[in-house]
Amino acid sequence: MGFWRIVITIILPPLGVLLGKGFGWAFIINILLTLLGYIPGLIHAFWVQTRD
């Protein structure tokens, strides 16, 4: 995970997931989690990106 992807993920978690994994279920789930609260979306975004 590069420096700019980390910065983008911190600022806008769904965008970080979109850039890392593309448009799919992980992106949709991250949007929902971010709408429920910033912290759950942020945790999910980092989890999705470091899963590989």
Curated annotation (Swiss-Prot):
Localization: Cell membrane
Biological-process GO terms, alphabetical: response to antibiotic
Name of protein: UPF0057 membrane protein YqaE
Gene: yqaE
Ranges that cross the membrane: 1-21, 23-43
InterPro entries (UniProt xref): PMP3
Bilayer topology annotation: Multi-pass membrane protein
Pfam families reported in the protein's UniProt record: Pmp3 (PF01679)
Matching PANTHER family: HYDROPHOBIC PROTEIN RCI2 LOW TEMPERATURE AND SALT RESPONSIVE PROTEIN LTI6 -RELATED, UPF0057 MEMBRANE PROTEIN ZK632.10-RELATED
Organism phylogeny: Bacteria, Pseudomonadati, Pseudomonadota, Gammaproteobacteria, Enterobacterales
Assigned protein family: Belongs to the UPF0057 (PMP3) family.
Organism: Escherichia coli (strain K12)
Any single Gene Ontology cellular-component annotation: plasma membrane
Main localization category: membrane
Keywords from the UniProt entry: Cell membrane, Membrane, Transmembrane, Transmembrane helix
